[in-house]
């Protein structure tokens, strides 16, 4: 049975030109919760997608400073996880969970 906390760890897949380029190297990019750790991300991907994860790299992308009608605001920070899968395994992120 899938633990419901796994759905809180992985927020969404990242579908950009750069993330599709790394998919050639058996890697997938996800937006994850800010407080998620690498072991939690690994467990969530393995449980939700049924694949073997060999490595997890994370990066916190700082939000941009935006101005609207003279007021300064800031976009939220986003944590990205680059998940490396075992040889011969893949995840189709264009379909849902």
From Swiss-Prot:
A Gene Ontology molecular function term of the record: rRNA binding
Alphabetized SUPFAM superfamilies for the sequence: Ribosomal proteins S24e, L23 and L15e (SSF54189)
Domain of life: Bacteria
Biological processes annotated in GO: translation
Keyword Ribosomal protein attached: yes
Family: Belongs to the universal ribosomal protein uL23 family.
Protein name: Large ribosomal subunit protein uL23
Species: Brucella melitensis biotype 2 (strain ATCC 23457)
């Amino acid at each position: 049975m899938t633990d419901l906390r796994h759905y809180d760890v992985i927020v969404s897949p990242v579908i950009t030109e750069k993330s599709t380029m790394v998919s050639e190297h058996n890697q997938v990019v996800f937006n994850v919760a800010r407080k998620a750790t690498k072991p939690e991300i690994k467990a969530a991907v393995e449980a939700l997608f049924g694949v073997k994860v060999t490595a997890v790299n994370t990066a916190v992308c700082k939000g941009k400073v935006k101005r609207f009608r003279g007021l300064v605001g800031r976009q939220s920070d986003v944590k990205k996880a680059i998940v490396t899968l075992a040889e011969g395994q893949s995840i189709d992120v264009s379909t849902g969970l």
